[in-house]
Amino acid sequence: SRKHYAVCVRFDNGHSGDGEKDFLRSMPDSIDAVILENAATLNSADLEDIPVLQTNFATKVLFSFNLTSIKENAESSGQEIKTLLAPALEQMVSAITDNGLDGASISYTGDIGLGNNAAVNASITEMRQLLLDKITPLAKNGKIFFLESNPLFIPEANRDVFTRYVLNTTSSKNASQLRLLINEAIYYAGIPSDKLLITGDPELMTTDNNDGLVSQVPFFAIQVIDCGPIGGLMIQNVAADYSHANITYKETRGAIQTLNPSPLK
């Protein structure tokens, strides 16, 4: 049987009044996972749509957890990280449990605690431990977690807690920059290639192999196979722009078709 590549999306949920594009039901089917930007505040439409996606399309619905902003808030307010992180993690677990979500995607772009500053490293270690202590039991009970960060943030002994490692590749200007990031994750960080996703943004362009400017999402979909093969593609900002004649929708559908061609009827 042919390999299935994951196509996952970030969705800015919780809006209404702007038409169908703002509802989860407007997602193309065959999406493997949708990360809800505002999973702490689900509206009635979200709550109606989530079980439909899960049941009819086997789509995993994940809570988006922004570790970067929590750390920055702690630093700017002079509080200890655990003072803000502990309640935020509790809120995440409650949202997952109460609303039947499949897990969470943890995004973090800060210092990963491998530098020379002992105080910084100690604070990062504490933050990471709080996170792992909270999500490891959930992972053992079947919830799934993505990591949107430098994979080295998670020690090797804890790597199995995460189903997918998502590389932020939207700033990659071409295939060779992309390949470099992929190879670093596989050969330096030791992440299995089938757990790895790259990220494309429908609003961004990149340079193709002939130095022409092309839309990032369709080009990156091809690179999942050409630069890998790796696990799949994460598409950012899916609800941001359905107005350009549904370009985002078409590109998302196109990426699914590129990676997992459906048999012709």
Regions found by a protein language model. Give the residues of each.
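Secreted glycan hydrolases and related glycan-binding modules that recognize and/or cleave
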Residues: 1-265
